[in-house]
């Protein structure tokens, strides 16, 4: 195994960095989107009720990465794996019951669907499907669950869209809980992005006269004895502390997330007349549960919304992991490709590291338990070595197995070449990518030298990323539009 010179030391500060550089896009509701996608609500709460999906696995940290094979419905993800797009990172999204996921309100007729991109690929089209009127919400999502005639198709024109787009679509009439499948067909790869959206059509929800939802108690963390959790209630003139309710954690049992959520909701109902907390049943009765409890505000009270805050008296432990030694490129040799890494821990942690190729195949894994300050070597040998983009996914957990953070580092495997003399080219592609202009010469991965074409084609020379390689010299599907081969 041969390695190129290490250009930079790669350190991963997992508590301060989130998201992956190769991620792409997700259904959002930042501006005028009618509803957030299932994966999006794993990462951020709903913009009006603060409801959030839980127990989502690794996709919580990368909602933009629900990527899978294209061609739906003829090909694409298998039945039962549609929500995850067969991406192991998103496997939890395939769970399907009537009450598993947060549902966003919607009406039939014209609605806007919004996509937010972290990498705006050349696009073939977007398609939107909806479940059949008689679908079974307690069975895994399959092709038979959906009306396979998309109710909305938006042409992408084989160009890059803006970083945020909105599509006006005519949503068919439905009742109750339905799932909308939004498919973004990327034009420069053999992949598509699949976002399912859990929606509830108006007219079937329990009605509570004179009350509106203004927030929720979301049991996001366990608390320790001495900590407290309290409501912050806001009206038209700002926060009104007279409506605040505080729960002090006086036992380890009460500190469990679902327990304090139930206890706080119960205390709100005992102390307040303008606020009520709990799940609303079909009879219009609000009852606290051991889980997420919506908070309702009395109409005419002047109250607008409720937030949950904490007073943490215990010192929260610090967790951090640094990963050193990952090269940006590895040359494929006669022996198996090997990553020689060094791990340094802050706090007592568990780490799970997995190497994937761009097709999401797992090639190597490594697990370790590290104590505070421990430095340990880690060697990962890949099961196969093929040229192209690869990813090292690092997951850090505390000693109880709770995920602290996840991040992804990119690297490439390249074939060994005998390069021409360095005087014949300006850069080894993709070094100096942003500086390429007409006439720039680069040494490509096939060992040949290519020269950037004159305007107006020179703009294509800088359009490259590990997941968008259509203009890569000598390799991409459209490389000849940007480059001339010199030798």
From Swiss-Prot:
Keywords: Chitin-binding, Secreted, Signal
Signal peptide as annotated in the record: 1-29
Pfam hit, one: GbpA_D3
GO CC terms in record: extracellular region
Disulfide bond sites: none
GO molecular function per UniProt: chitin binding
InterPro entries: Cellulose/chitin-bd_N, GbpA_2, GbpA_D3, GlcNAc-bd_A, GlcNAc_Chitin_IntDeg, Ig_E-set
Ranges of residues in domain Chitin-binding type-3: 438-479
UniProt record similarity statement: Belongs to the GbpA family.
Name listed for the protein in its UniProt record: GlcNAc-binding protein A
Protein encoded by which gene: gbpA
């Amino acid at each position: 195994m041969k390695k190129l010179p290490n250009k930079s030391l790669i350190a991963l500060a997992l508590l301060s960095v989130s998201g992956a550089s190769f991620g792409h896009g997700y259904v959002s509701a930042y501006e005028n989107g009618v509803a957030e996608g299932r994966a999006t609500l794993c990462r951020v709460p709903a913009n009006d009720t603060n409801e959030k999906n839980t127990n989502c696995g690794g996709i919580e940290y990368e909602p933009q990465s629900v990527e899978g094979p294209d061609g739906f419905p003829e090909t694409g993800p298998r039945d039962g794996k549609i929500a995850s797009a067969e991406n192991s990172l998103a496997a939890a999204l395939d769970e399907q019951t009537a009450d598993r996921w947060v549902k966003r309100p919607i009406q039939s007729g014209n609605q806007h669907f919004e996509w937010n991109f972290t990498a705006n690929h050349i696009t073939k089209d977007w398609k939107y499907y909806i479940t059949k009127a008689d679908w079974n919400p307690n069975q895994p999502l399959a092709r038979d669950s959906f009306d396979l005639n998309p109710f909305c198709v938006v042409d992408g024109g084989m160009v890059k869209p803006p970083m945020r787009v909105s599509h006006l679509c005519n949503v068919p009439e439905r009742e109750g809980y339905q799932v909308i499948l939004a498919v973004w067909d990327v034009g420069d790869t053999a992949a598509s992005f699949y976002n399912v959206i859990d929606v509830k059509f108006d007219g079937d929800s329990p009605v509570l006269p004179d009350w509106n939802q203004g927030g929720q108690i979301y049991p996001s963390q366990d608390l320790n004895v001495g900590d407290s959790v309290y409501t912050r209630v806001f009206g038209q003139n700002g926060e009104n502390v007279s409506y605040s309710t505080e729960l002090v954690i006086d036992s380890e049992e009460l500190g469990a997330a679902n327990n304090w959520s139930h206890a706080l909701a119960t205390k709100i109902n005992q102390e307040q007349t303008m606020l009520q907390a709990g799940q609303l049943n079909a009879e219009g009765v609000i009852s606290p549960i051991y889980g997420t409890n919506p908070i309702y505000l009395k109409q005419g009270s002047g109250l607008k919304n409720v937030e949950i805050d904490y007073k943490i008296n215990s010192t929260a432990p610090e967790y951090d992991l640094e990963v050193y030694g990952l090269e940006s490129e590895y040359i494929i040799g006669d022996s198996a490709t090997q990553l020689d890494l060094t791990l340094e821990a802050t706090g007592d942690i568990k780490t799970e590291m997995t190497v994937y190729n761009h097709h999401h195949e797992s090639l190597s894994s490594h697990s370790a338990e590290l104590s505070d300050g421990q430095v340990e070597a880690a060697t990962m040998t890949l099961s196969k070595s093929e040229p192209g983009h690869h990813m090292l996914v690092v997951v850090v957990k505390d000693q109880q197995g709770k995920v602290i953070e996840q991040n992804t580092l990119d690297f490439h495997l390249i074939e060994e070449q005998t390069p021409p003399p360095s005087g014949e080219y300006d850069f080894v592609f993709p070094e100096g990518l942003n500086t390429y202009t007409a006439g720039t010469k680069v040494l490509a991965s096939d060992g040949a030298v290519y020269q950037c074409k004159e305007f107006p084609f020179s703009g294509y020379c800088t359009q490259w990323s590990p997941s968008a390689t259509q203009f890569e010299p000598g390799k991409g599907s459209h490389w000849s539009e940007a480059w001339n081969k010199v030798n």
